[in-house]
Design a protein with these regions (language model features):
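Small-residue-enriched segments and motifs
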Residues: 4, 18, 43, 389, ...
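Inter-lobe coupling/hinge segments of SF2-like helicase ATPases
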Residues: 192-201, 216-650, 690-693, 700
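Accessory, non-ATPase domains that flank or precede helicase/AAA+ motor cores in DNA-metabolism machines
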Residues: 1-356, 368-384, 666, 693, ...
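AMP-binding (ANL) adenylation modules
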Residues: 35-38, 254, 628-630, 681-683
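Nucleotide-binding motor/catalytic cores of P-loop/tubulin-like NTPases across gene-expression machines
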Residues: 667, 685-688
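Intrinsically disordered or highly flexible coil/loop and linker segments, enriched in small
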Residues: 89-93, 104, 150, 420, ...
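Short amphipathic alpha-helix segments
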Residues: 615, 650-674
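Short proline/glycine- and acidic-rich turn/helix-capping motifs at secondary-structure junctions
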Residues: 672-685, 721-732
Length: 732
């Protein structure tokens, strides 16, 4: 008797065996419907076997097979299996997340028949004789049916169609879907609208000449300053791939998927371009997946999950703003789309082109190791006015809720000239640090020489490297001042202060809270463009993708929260944010000014960024990372647990730590185990959050440790919700 082995979308690191009925045939990669507990689940077949270790009386039969063929190409199956193994995620969850929601729910993977309304002979007669003159809506509907009206498309309302059907004026006609590849749909049109194509400058032409003759897999890093014309390179590279008859996948950050981006691609090409964005419903997402798989679409533009789209013949992958943190999935299985795209391209033997004005340190290290090939665009396509940049030393400065008097005066000067001002708060990776406003002294752990993190809830200082903690000091350990402050400021708090200081100017605060409702962001942006708001407050949402010609002053308000963050990547993100922010000022004809507020103007990395630019900053930061044995010169994995009861989450991670200490003794003496300790934001939505960080200089050894954990610990029953994040980007 054959048995079928199923991967189910459950957080368990194993497969499930079922009886295969004699009348049923299945193939690996097809979906099946199976009983699971009291529910029915859609799973994916991973094997058909003749033997099983499960007692026969405990086995249940497969209820139904949903596909005749595998939903995954051999390359895609290999790729997703590799991803599940690398991120130590259950294969059932990975395969399920790689499919559109409708397929996870059991809908057909093949395009369905379309049902149309068509006039009957009586209906044709009614039209010819004008029998519906008094029923205007029915007449319009019957005329639409004559031209071919799809039943699901219902602009007239179901009552109109019911009335026409009752009169026997219409009938339903089934039509098989007509599948034409994107090449067939071109007919006599050229692939490219050549009138839209720009002439490349000397640097762009040199870069493109290298891309043009790419054969097979190459990981290209296009390192181009803002405004250097990376998008034009993308477009001409896509043209080359389309000329080969192949498809292209373009991955963009969440906040980079704007109508302007899409319209530029659509203006250039006469091919079918599908876009995967958050406003699509589940049916529309399924249709995009089906069109790509059958070769009907030529280009797919989407955010990170678009990577899992099935293609008929994928020829290249492009990743714009490859350094952007939104390419890392932050719920479910925590993959990084950038890293997976490189792996997938290598498996398919196709090029991957990654563009960035501020490449992450991991990518620059890959260039140094010869894993990536670097292409540079250092010249702006359109030269703009040079920026003035100044650092405000906050020590001894009079402050108003995070705003220095110098900044307030500069804001006043720009506003009085009728210009706009943009204030940025750096919140990502933020962990509050206690420092002295008078001299800049910080409370540091004497065991680790690292700043303590301030935990407001428990009113203590805690070291997130060795777990040491101490009470809040009453005065500065250096100068004796009682002016001890914490780094960090909220956008709402800043908005309240600005309303008091600048009561006569419009203020637009743009963050996740104020733009949560659909259409809010567009409304704020329209107010800014129309000059209704003169002061703009934002987080990274405003850092890129928007053109504000009247903004002449940009300020980074809380630089210190990044310079001494618990997250070792915070300085890198600050530098990337600074380069993006600097690009917001002086985009029109007027000169722009950029201000940074800090208690530590002499910080070496800050100085290298301001005086020598991002590239030198990144090289210096890499040297520092290597000395500290931090990624990319080591590998990390982060366990996160949360529970309504703090001690439950702590106890679970303590149990994990105890097991891992034994593994360390047995096979990984260089393994560092940090924690368990409360997360920097230790309570969220009523849940207490704890974490346990692992680090090892060898990626392979760390994965051996995680494989042992997966085998021995991962499937043990617990009421505490926990996740494993391999190569974590966010330690907060």
């Amino acid at each position: 008797m054959p048995f079928v082995r199923i991967a189910l979308p459950v957080p368990l690191y194993r497969y499930f065996d079922y009886i295969l009925p004699a009348s049923m045939k299945v193939v690996v990669g097809a979906r099946v419907l199976v009983p699971f507990g009291a529910q029915k689940r859609v799973g994916v077949v991973v094997d058909v076997v003749e033997q099983t270790d499960v007692p026969k009386e405990q086995l249940k039969p497969v209820l139904g097979c949903l596909d005749d063929t595998s939903l995954f190409s051999p390359e895609s199956w290999q790729f997703l299996s590799w991803a599940a193994n690398y991120y130590h995620a259950p294969l059932g969850e990975v395969l399920s997340q790689a499919l559109p929601v409708k397929l996870r729910q059991g809908e057909s993977a093949v395009e369905k028949q379309k049902i149309f309304w068509k006039p009957t002979a009586l209906g044709e007669q009614a039209l010819a004789q004008g029998l519906l003159k008094r029923s205007k809506k029915q007449l319009e509907a019957l005329q639409a049916a004559k031209n071919g009206m799809e039943k699901g498309n219902n602009p007239f309302g179901s009552g109109i169609w019911s009335a026409l059907k009752a009169k026997e004026y219409i009938t339903e006609i089934a039509q098989e879907p007509e599948i034409q590849t994107w090449q067939q749909q071109l007919v006599d049109k050229p692939i490219v609208n050549k009138a839209d194509r720009l002439i490349l400058n000397t640097q762009q032409a040199l870069v493109f000449s290298q891309l043009k003759f790419t054969q097979g897999f190459v990981a290209w890093l296009l390192d181009g300053v803002t405004g250097s014309g990376k998008t034009e390179i993308y477009l001409q590279f896509i043209e080359e791939i389309l000329n080969q008859g192949k498809q292209v996948l373009v991955l963009v950050p969440e906040i980079g998927l704007t109508p302007q981006t899409v319209s530029r691609f659509q203006a250039r090409f006469n091919v079918v371009i599908d876009v995967l964005h958050s406003n699509l419903n589940d049916t529309q997402r399924l249709h995009v997946w089906q069109r790509a798989r059958s070769g009907q679409s030529a280009v797919i533009i989407g955010t990170r999950s678009a990577l899992f789209t099935q293609f008929a013949d994928l020829g290249a992958i492009i990743i714009d703003e490859k350094h952007d943190a939104s390419f890392k999935q932050q719920d479910g299985w925590r993959y990084h789309a950038r890293d997976l795209a490189v792996v997938y391209a290598k498996q398919l033997n196709i090029p991957v082109l990654m563009g960035s004005a501020t490449p992450c340190l991991e990518s620059l290290n890959n260039v140094q190791q010869g894993k990536y090939q670097r292409l540079c665009l250092s010249e702006k396509a359109n030269q703009s006015t040079a920026l003035q940049q100044h650092v405000i030393d906050l020590k001894h400065q009079s402050m108003r809720n995070g705003l220095s008097e110098i900044l307030i005066k500069r804001m006043q000067a720009h506003l009085e000239k009728g210009n706009q001002v943009l204030l940025f708060l750096n919140r990502r990776g933020f962990a509050p640090v206690l420092l002295c406003h008078e001299c800049g002294w910080m409370a540091e752990c004497r065991h680790c020489d690292k700043p303590y993190t301030y935990h407001q809830q428990h009113n203590v200082l805690r070291c997130h490297h060795c777990s040491a903690q101490k009470p809040i000091p009453r005065q500065c350990g250096n100068c004796g001042s009682t002016q001890l402050i914490t780094t960090g400021l909220g956008t709402e708090q800043l908005e309240d202060t600005l309303k008091t200081v600048f009561p006569n100017y419009g203020i637009a605060r743009i963050d996740r809270d104020t733009t949560a409702r659909k259409g809010k962001l567009e409304g704020y942006l329209a107010d800014i463009q129309q000059g209704k708001s003169q002061i703009l407050i934002g987080t990274q949402m405003l850092a890129k993708g928007h053109h504000f010609p009247n903004v002449t002053l940009v300020a980074l308000v809380n630089v210190d929260s990044a310079l001494f963050s618990l997250d070792f990547r915070a300085e890198e993100r600050l530098a990337q944010l600074y380069m993006q922010v600097a690009g917001r000022a002086g985009r029109g004809a007027q000169q722009g000014e950029v201000l940074l507020q800090t208690h530590y103007p002499e910080n070496p990395l800050l100085q290298s960024l301001l005086q020598q630019g991002y590239n030198q900053f990144a090289l210096n930061a890499l040297v520092l990372r290597k000395a500290m044995r931090l990624p990319p010169f080591s590998s990390q994995a982060l366990f996160k647990a949360q529970s309504r009861h703090s001690e439950d989450a702590e106890h679970l991670l303590a149990k994990f730590s105890e097991y891992l200490q034994q593994v360390k003794r047995d096979m990984a003496p260089e393994l560092q185990i940090l924690g368990p300790m409360p997360a920097p934001f230790s309570k969220k939505a009523g849940q207490y959050r704890w974490q346990l960080l692992l680090q090892h200089p060898s990626r392979a050894t760390l994965h051996q440790v995680l494989t042992a954990f997966e085998r021995d610990q991962a499937d043990q029953a617990t009421k505490v919700r926990w996740i494993l994040d391999v190569d974590p980007l966010d330690l907060s």
